[in-house]
Amino acid sequence: MTSITRLFLILSGLLLSTFQVNALTMTAEETVRESTQEVLDRLHTDQDKLESNPKYIQVIVEELIVPHFDFATMSHLVLGKYWHEINESRQICFIHGFKNLLVRRYADIFLGYDDKIIAYQPTEPAEDEGVVIVKQTVTRPGEEPFFIEYPVRPDDNGWKVIDLVVEGISLLKSYHGTFQSEINEQGLQAFIQSIKECNAQEIKYDSQSMVIDTVLDFL
């Protein structure tokens, strides 16, 4: 894992939290504010469970993070031009693999990430149509603040995260560079085949709702 990637994961483990959206009756900023507090409350409420069973953090991650990220779009963006060079089944397994990569990393760092002071700046539209940038300043006592941006866009279920930008550096661009190097070294098909999730025996795909399922337990 690159140092840039590690920085993103440490800074954003909690902040890439759930976006409990009531359709689009809430603004993007209101959604981030409410859901961030919900995660803080959940970690406090479940402190005993987390201390006795650290793996319980994966339950929280699955419940509060996964449903509110557009992993299909993120996977497409992070692979870039290679996305259209792999077939649909490979696209599906890559989505699972990329999602699970993030889930595992979040679970690793969640337990020790607390005592944050979170402030918000005015939300701005992004260059891409329909995308809104939610801005946070995150400070821990005695440390310099970090500036974090959440590019989010609406779908039928509310606002969905499509990237994370910390101090001006995009998470997707960081992973894109890492994956590009691996593809250059071993080739696209070998890179895809190296992903555990791409060894599934059966993959089912509902293109209408982006419901992705396999016979394997990926977590």
What are these regions (language model features)?
Residues 8-18:
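Bacterial N-terminal signal peptides
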Residues 104-146, 198-219:
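Surface-exposed, charged secondary-structure patches
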Residues 25-106:
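Early exported N-terminus immediately downstream of N-terminal targeting peptides
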Residues 19-24:
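Sec/Tat signal peptide C-region and signal peptidase I cleavage site
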Residues 1-8:
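Bacterial N-terminal signal peptides that target proteins for export
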